[in-house]
């Protein structure tokens, strides 16, 4: 159980990578831009991949009626997400420590994994809602209006995950380093659960096969 607890602690600490690396990355490439434009989405705000990327993206979006990229203080998520991550790290360290001294068993590690998974799904759902609003809630007085074949205004929602063609732009949306560290951390906590479970099974087997004392 001690080995499982150490892995649980290491897995929880991996989440701290979200404060150093971006969670998600969106890139826009087009023939007129030899160097693609991009934005890195951190849990504390949005930054351009290069110095003037956000400024250039906002300039392009202005013509088709899209909103400017929000500042950190304009979205509640950038205040709440860091608190949630810190809370989950502390909880993971606490569970790992209690497991190390034998106060709790491996099932608590699975509980942490399930809770983190639910929070992750909620975060992705919220991210998708923002992408939908960002790409669909357009200024009716935009300089350029593109109409679909059915007569409805074209929307410019970036993909939640993967690739999409928007006008003459190739748009990609992919997990960044912070997300991969989070996935690795969550996987480690799941590994900790299985190691703890196997350890308990082994201990139970040894107890059952222990010869009776005359």
Describe every region a protein language model picked out:
Residues 2-6, 91-122, 189-214:
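Juxtamembrane interface at the cytosolic side of transmembrane helices
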Residues 3-28:
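N-terminal signal-anchor transmembrane alpha helix
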Residues 20-78, 128-173:
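Long, glycine/tryptophan/cysteine-rich extracytoplasmic
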């Amino acid at each position: 159980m001690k080995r499982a607890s150490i892995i649980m602690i290491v897995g929880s600490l991996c989440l701290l990578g979200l404060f150093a690396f971006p969670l998600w990355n969106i890139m826009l490439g087009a023939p007129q831009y030899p160097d693609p434009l991009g934005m890195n989405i951190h849990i504390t705000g949005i930054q351009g991949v290069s110095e003037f990327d956000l400024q250039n993206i906002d300039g392009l979006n202005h013509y088709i009626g899209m909103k400017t990229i929000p500042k950190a203080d304009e979205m509640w998520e950038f205040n709440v997400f860091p608190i949630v991550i810190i809370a989950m790290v502390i909880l993971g360290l606490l569970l790992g420590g209690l497991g190390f001294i034998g106060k709790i068993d491996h099932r608590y590690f699975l509980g942490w994994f399930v809770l983190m998974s639910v929070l992750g799904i909620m975060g992705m759902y919220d991210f998708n809602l923002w992408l939908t609003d960002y790409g669909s809630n357009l200024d009716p007085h935009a300089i350029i209006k593109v109409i679909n074949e059915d007569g409805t205004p074209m929307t410019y929602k970036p993909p939640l995950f993967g690739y999409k063609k928007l006008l003459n732009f190739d748009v990609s949306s992919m997990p960044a380093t912070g997300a991969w560290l989070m996935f690795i951390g969550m996987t480690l906590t799941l590994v900790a659960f299985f190691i703890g479970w196997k350890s308990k099974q082994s201990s139970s087997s040894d107890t059952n096969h222990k010869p009776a004392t005359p």
